[in-house]
Curated annotation (Swiss-Prot):
Transmembrane segments: none
Native species: Lithobates pipiens (Northern leopard frog)
Annotated substrate binding sites: K42, P43, V44, N45, T46
Protein name, as recorded: Amphinase-1
Coiled coil: none
Length: 114
């Protein structure tokens, strides 16, 4: 697989969820081995409640590696500040800033415009 495809697959796993805000649980999700590759709790992670299409759309016509802002707002859940891997969870609706590489989202930069 090309590098962008692998990075996009990783981005989807780490940042896009089909679960509703009501069903989403930071502790259950963040303690999954996918988010603790080195056995450490990740300090913060933001999840986008969306299908993949609208997120990938942000990177349409993005050549090379560039940060882009979404034109629409997304429902987001941020899991952060784990104490012994127990996370605080906050929900918001906002724009997102992501890094695109050749039309694929590869990195979540921040909540809000770039």
């Amino acid at each position: 697989k090309p590098k962008e495809d692998r990075e996009w697959e990783k981005f989807k796993t780490k940042h896009i969820t089909s679960q509703s805000v009501a069903d989403f649980n930071c502790n259950r999700t963040m303690n999954d081995p996918a988010y603790t590759p080195d056995g450490q709790c990740k300090p913060v992670n933001t999840f986008i409640h969306s299908t993949t299409g609208p997120v990938k759309e942000i990177c349409r016509r993005a050549t090379g590696r560039v940060n882009k802002s979404s034109t629409q707002q997304f429902t987001l859940t941020t899991c952060k500040n784990p104490i012994r891997c127990k996370y605080s969870q906050s929900n918001t609706t906002n724009f997102i800033c992501i890094t695109c590489r050749d039309n694929y989202p590869v990195h979540f930069v921040k909540t809000g415009k770039c």
